[in-house]
């Protein structure tokens, strides 16, 4: 009888240990112990699970990305930064129609190029005159970001912005400290003027600015 009890105790211990091992999950990341062997690494890495916000992002399933800027009127993928704001005059722009159609198509979030590489801003930024404020659209009083934001609110759509770090128009681009401040001011405007922004897209492109210099981005700012 004692022998049977001993065997049962051993089995229970093994099951308990196995259960602890299988149920140990790591959210977002895992920190390995000192000098672990490959088996330990593989076992621990296999139990890393996403953060709750990452799971919520996956549930969005489909997001619309709108590339709309001066390039729309010059038929160029990338602008040069020398285009005149006078070219921007979308007299029939209807952000509500955009969002309504996207919502009907099953999209749950819209992201727009608030600024692409040409440096033209779709909102009346205080950082540069290269924006909608200098265009004939609505006599310089239009704001594409505001109209899209309001349309997203109306249709229950999440809202995001793309802000290109590369700026082919800004004279301070290439003067790393100055442009980093300039860029942070633009990002701050977008994140504080329009309510909740659900997602921000950056870009790894790093070409030359109007002065022929490249920028060292302060990604940790």
Regions found by a protein language model. Give the residues of each.
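Bacterial Sec-dependent N-terminal signal peptides
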Residues: 1-24
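Mature catalytic domains of secreted/periplasmic carbohydrate-active enzymes
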Residues: 21-221
């Amino acid at each position: 009888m004692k022998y049977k009890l001993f065997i049962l105790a051993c089995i229970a211990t093994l099951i308990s240990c196995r259960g602890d091992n299988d149920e140990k999950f790591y959210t977002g990341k895992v920190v390995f112990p000192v000098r672990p062997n490959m088996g330990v690494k593989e076992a621990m890495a296999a139990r890393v699970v996403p953060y709750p916000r990452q799971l919520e992002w996956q549930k969005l399933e489909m997001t619309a990305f709108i590339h709309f800027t001066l390039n729309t009127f010059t038929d160029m993928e990338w602008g040069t930064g020398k285009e005149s704001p006078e070219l921007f005059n979308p007299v029939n722009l209807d952000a509500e129609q955009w969002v309504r159609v996207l919502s009907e198509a099953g999209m749950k979030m819209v992201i727009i190029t608030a600024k692409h590489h040409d440096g033209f801003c779709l909102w009346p930024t205080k950082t540069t005159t290269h924006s909608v404020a200098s265009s004939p659209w609505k006599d310089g009083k239009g704001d594409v970001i505001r109209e899209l934001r309001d349309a997203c609110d109306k249709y229950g759509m999440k809202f995001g912005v793309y802000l290109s770090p590369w700026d082919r128009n800004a004279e301070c681009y290439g003067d790393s400290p100055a442009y980093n401040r300039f860029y942070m001011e633009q990002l701050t405007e977008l994140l504080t003027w329009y309510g909740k922004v659900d997602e921000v897209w950056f870009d790894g492109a790093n070409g030359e600015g109007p002065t022929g210099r490249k920028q060292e981005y302060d990604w940790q700012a």
